[in-house]
Each structure stands twice: as C-alpha cells, then as structure tokens.
C-alpha cells in the first residue's frame, strides 16, 4: 500500500511537471528571447527525471522484478532513458545543441506514459511464467536503450534533411508551419549561426557556410549516436534469442515483434553500410535513418496496439467507459 501510494504521488508529480514544461515549451516557441522560461523548463525536466527515477525504484522494490513487464512500465523506462540522453550533452558542454533535439521526444513520451490512457497498467502485477527470468532485465532494457538512442540519432538525421531542404518545400516554411519550431530544428540553426558569428567577427562569413558546418556536425552526431544504438540493438536481439530458446525451445520464431525488430536492425545496418560509401554520406544516409525513426515506433508501439504474437504481454488497450 505504501509503495502504491508513493508511485501514485510520483506519477502525478511527473505528469503535473511535464504539463507545465509543455506549456513553457509552447511559449518559448513564440518568444525566443524568454531565456528565463527556458531555464525553468530545464529545471522542470530535471524534477521530472528524479520523479521517474523514484517511481522505477519504488516499482522495482514493491514488485520484486525490474519494472519492464508491460507497455506502461516500458514507456516510463524509455522516457527515463531519453532524459539521460538529453542530460549527457549538457553535462559535457552546456552549449551543446544535441539536447535540443531530444527535448520534444522526452516531453511527449513522458506525457503519454503518465496520461490516463494506460490506467489499467498502473498496478504492478505478478509476472507470467515466461517472463520470470533474469533475461527480462537484460533483454528488454537493452532493447529500450537501443530504441531511445536510435530515436535520437534518427531525429538528428531528420534535422539535417529539414535544414538542408527546408527552402525547397513550402511545407517547411517557418511562416506557414510551426513544425520546425516544435522540434527545435530552426532553433539549432539559429543558435549555431549566432555562435559562429561571435567566433568569426574578424572576417565575413556567408550564411551557407553556417548551414554547411551545421549539417556536417549533425551528420557526425547522428552517425555516432546511431552506431551506439545499433550496438545496443544487436546485443538486445541476441539476448532475446537466447531467452527465447530457454522459454520456447527456439532461438527465432518470426513473431511480429521479432520480425519488426529484424526490419529495424536491417534499416540501421543499411544506414551504417551506406556511410562507407562517400557518395551516400550526408543526405542519402540521413534519409535511411529518418525512415528508421518510423520503423522503431512501429516495432515498439505499433505491435503493442495489435496485441498479437508471443510478445503481447501488457499490450495497449483503450480504457473502457
């Protein structure tokens, strides 16, 4: 009862804080100069991170197993991982714009996880026999860590494409669409150009030079982050194969989740392979990574919507009225 009450309090604190952060985020989209509000948003995200950490620890202690048994718990863990990825660049360099990319994903994931749509999964339950294994923490945590990392890397590639081609399509016009501002792509370009201008006041630099520098930097970031995510995904799939052999007597069953995990792995393998070809670096490889962003969400969330296959434990269902 104590742990259930604590989890309830931490969840409400997290949801309330993230709601305030979303409001601040929307305000700063309209008024870029409100530096104080942006700092308040970062403090709110830190408070939410500690609330999530407290929730995960409480759920782990009360249930006796690592909290990854259903979609609700995995979403909480995914948002917790995104918070870490959001924080690391700021610790290394307070002016690193990589954290700017992760902000919307972190906010939206946590907002959905703590909303009322997953109320039926809020209560901790006893694991089904197939999940009562030490492989649960190893396999699922590796998969979620890889998803979070690959999502960030894919967003960096998407930012590269949008910044490079935004003038070619009316859809990406800042005057007509708030899409760029919502995901901070224009903010990155603005901050980078401003910072470069301060460093190069002794001689004139053309705007296209800032654009070139920024896209090259995004390309480098994307490659590094996706390489890490691909490694984690490979380890996660291998752990899952070993666990499947112990539980079901077969390393691979072409279950829908397994099939889409293989598709995800293939997409990012193609991305990494394309990086070895100089002609495919930059725009072409970024396009592959951007496709991977959608594939990850299908693999992770889309399959849970269907609730089919061997990986249907804790699948998503709409609350009944």
Curated annotation (Swiss-Prot):
TM helices/strands, residue ranges: 9-29, 44-64, 68-88, 143-163, 225-245, 259-273, 288-308
Cellular location(s): Plastid, Chloroplast thylakoid membrane
A single GO molecular function term of this UniProt record: heme binding
Gene Ontology cellular-component terms listed: chloroplast thylakoid membrane
A Pfam match: Cytochrom_C_asm
Membrane topology designation: Multi-pass membrane protein
Keywords for the protein's UniProt record, in alphabetical order: Chloroplast, Cytochrome c-type biogenesis, Membrane, Plastid, Thylakoid, Transmembrane, Transmembrane helix
One GO biological process term: cytochrome complex assembly
Main localization (coarse): plastid
Function: Required during biogenesis of c-type cytochromes (cytochrome c6 and cytochrome f) at the step of heme attachment.
NCBIfam families xref list: cytochr_II_ccsB (TIGR03144)
Family the UniProt entry places it in: Belongs to the CcmF/CycK/Ccl1/NrfE/CcsA family.
PANTHER family in the record: CYTOCHROME B_B6 PROTEIN-RELATED, HEME EXPORTER PROTEIN C
Subunit comment: May interact with Ccs1.
HAMAP family the UniProt entry points to: CytC_CcsA
UniProt-recorded name of the protein: Cytochrome c biogenesis protein CcsA
Organism: Sorghum bicolor
């Amino acid at each position: 009862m104590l742990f259930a009450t604590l989890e309830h309090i931490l969840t409400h604190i997290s949801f309330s804080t993230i709601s305030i952060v979303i409001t601040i985020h929307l305000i700063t989209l309209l008024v870029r100069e409100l530096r104080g509000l942006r700092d308040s948003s970062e403090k709110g995200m830190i408070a939410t991170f500690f609330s999530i950490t407290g929730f995960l620890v409480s759920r782990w202690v009360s249930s006796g197993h690592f909290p990854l048994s259903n979609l609700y718990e995995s979403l909480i863990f995914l948002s917790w991982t995104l918070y870490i990825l959001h924080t690391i660049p700021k610790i290394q360099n307070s002016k690193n714009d990589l954290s700017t990319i992760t902000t919307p994903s972190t906010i939206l994931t946590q907002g959905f996880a703590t909303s009322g749509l997953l109320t039926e999964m809020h209560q901790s339950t006893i694991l089904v026999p197939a999940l009562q294994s030490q492989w649960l923490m190893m396999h699922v945590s590796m998969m979620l860590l890889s998803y979070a990392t690959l999502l960030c890397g894919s967003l960096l590639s998407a930012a590269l494409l949008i910044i490079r081609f935004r003038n070619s399509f009316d859809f990406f016009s800042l005057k007509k669409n708030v899409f760029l501002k919502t995901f901070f792509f224009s903010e990155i370009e603005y901050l980078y150009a401003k910072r470069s201008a301060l460093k190069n006041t002794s001689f004139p630099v053309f705007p296209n030079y800032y654009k070139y520098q920024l896209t090259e930097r995004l390309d480098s970031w994307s490659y590094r982050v996706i390489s890490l995510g691909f490694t984690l995904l490979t380890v996660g799939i291998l752990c899952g194969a070993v666990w499947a052999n112990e539980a079901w007597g077969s390393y691979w069953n072409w279950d829908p989740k397994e099939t889409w995990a293989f598709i995800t792995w293939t997409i990012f393998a193609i991305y990494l392979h394309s990086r070895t070809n100089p002609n495919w670096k930059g725009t072409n490889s970024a396009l592959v990574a951007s496709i991977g962003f959608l594939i990850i969400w299908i693999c992770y969330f889309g399959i849970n919507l269907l609730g089919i296959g061997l990986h249907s434990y804790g699948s998503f269902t709409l609350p009944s009225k």
